[in-house]
Swiss-Prot record:
Protein task: Strong inhibitory activity toward subtilisin BPN' and, to a lesser extent, toward trypsin.
Keyword Disulfide bond in annotation: yes
Site residues, Reactive bond: 67-68
Subcellular location: Secreted
Keyword Nucleus: no
Subunit structure: Homodimer.
Protein name (record): Subtilisin inhibitor-like protein 5
Family listed: Belongs to the protease inhibitor I16 (SSI) family.
A GO term for molecular function: serine-type endopeptidase inhibitor activity
Length: 107
């Protein structure tokens, strides 16, 4: 198995550089799901389904969200299938984060 080791964060703000970190977890997916992530099996399954492409993650698309702007920024840094990854995305609020990113950033 190629190495998979990630640090995932959720922060309050518009960019990772200026945001206030709220939560951080570790996630490993090989040889078995683990780390401090509360649901590593679901998160790893979701990442495998999109070949590790964080931008392709899809959460609960049927969920309706209110339009209050309270931005959260998520980051992922580490190694996926032996390749370095660095990902950052800002969501309008916690509801859109869960709707669009799913179990990977549910912590």
């Amino acid at each position: 198995h190629a190495p998979n080791a990630l640090v995932l964060t959720v922060a309050k703000g518009e960019t990772a550089r200026t945001a206030t970190p709220l939560r951080a977890v570790t996630l490993t997916c090989a040889p078995t799901p683990g780390g401090t992530h509360p649901a590593p099996e679901a998160a790893c399954a979701e990442l495998r389904a999109v070949d590790g492409r964080f931008s392709a993650l899809r959460g609960d698309q049927d969920r309706a969200c209110i339009k209050i702007y309270d931005p959260l920024v998520v980051t992922a840094e580490g190694v996926w299938e032996g390749q370095r990854v660095r990902y950052e995305r800002t969501f309008g609020n916690s509801c859109t984060l869960q709707t669009e990113a799913g179990p990977v950033f549910s912590f």
